[in-house]
């Protein structure tokens, strides 16, 4: 799938994400009953790109691994990430970041890069799957589902229209999941 150079870049992003999210946990519990490391979320998003959407684009995998780094870490700044990975990847990460939170959905609506929308679809799918954890309130679940239907479904419908033909069936699967 990936050249040795691309593989090294992905490993670099993987370990930077792991480092940047060190000590952070999500509400979901792992098999031991402990909170899941936050890093597992970004890892699952990247894996969804590969396994579900069958995308083997190095820049997309790196952006998926680092998609929450700007808003949720102190060490992984846009400047550092641009120095390491370049402008294209950091542009995707910035579009996926809720910094600033105001105008986030509007920025995604104005985004004309199907790759960003594909990463967001995998991100949202992972977030929705984690709603099934014990202790998540019905109110929070309903809020997340409503937000997904109102704000994200239009983006995912656009993704289905704008993605390359060879990804269309898999993208439709993510949207319908």
Where is each model-derived feature located?
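Active-site helical microenvironments for divalent-metal-assisted chemistry
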Residues: 1-177
């Amino acid at each position: 799938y990936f050249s040795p150079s691309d593989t090294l870049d992905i490993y670099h992003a993987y370990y930077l994400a792991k480092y940047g999210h060190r000590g952070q946990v999500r509400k979901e519990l792992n098999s031991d009953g402990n909170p899941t490391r936050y890093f597992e979320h970004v890892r699952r998003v990247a894996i969804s790109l590969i396994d579900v959407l069958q995308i083997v684009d190095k820049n997309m995998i790196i952006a998926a691994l680092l998609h929450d780094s700007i808003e949720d870490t102190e060490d992984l700044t846009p400047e550092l990430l641009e120095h390491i990975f370049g402008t294209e990847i950091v542009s995707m990460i910035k579009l996926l970041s809720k910094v600033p939170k105001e105008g986030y959905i509007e920025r995604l609506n104005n985004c004309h890069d199907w790759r960003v929308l594909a990463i967001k679809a995998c991100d949202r799918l992972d977030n929705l799957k984690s709603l099934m954890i014990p202790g998540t309130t019905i109110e929070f679940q309903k809020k997340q589902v409503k937000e997904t239907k109102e704000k994200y479904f239009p983006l995912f419908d656009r993704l289905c229209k704008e993605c390359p033909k060879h990804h269309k069936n898999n993208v439709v699967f993510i949207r319908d999941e």
